[in-house]
Amino acid sequence: MQKTCMGVINRKIDQDIFGELATSTVNLGAAVTSNTLRVLRGKTVLGNNDVPWDGNITFVLTPATEAFMMGENDFSSRDFTMNGPFDYADPAWKDRPIVYRWLGMNWIVHPNLNGGGGPASATEETYMFHKSAIGHAFNADDLEAKAGYDEEQDYSWARCSIYMGSQLLQGSGVVIIAHDGSSLAAA
């Protein structure tokens, strides 16, 4: 139960960070389907904003964005990446997002990233950012993860509490790349 409770905390941390990334004013415009050129455009915008290309760039994307990128030979081929999307056996069974490494960036596919439009919608937002552009802090000393059993009432319980916060530190270090994933929505 404590593990499940901490999973809830971790998802809340993700949502806080995504909420701050969404406040960036740098974007690539209207939502279209993703491809290699669009990703390279985002990378170029970061470079033009003097963001250091030091291995600390992350691209957080939706499952629909990943699906479109899998159709790009540059992304899915072993010839172009050291840590590609097919390097992990059965990633769906892991309780954390899988990290790919491509174009000098960490790629994280996150199922709860949608920019408010819902999964596989025409308004998905993905974020390309430098590590120093976003901050997240929590009070580790006050983190509580407790579980127990009440014999009198015959029920189990779990509770986690944490004091935390996220903040966009450098707006120019984040690029919002809107993606149209509507063609992959369930019928």
Task: Describe these PLM feature segments.
Residues 72-187:
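Sequence/fold signature of self-assembling virion shell proteins
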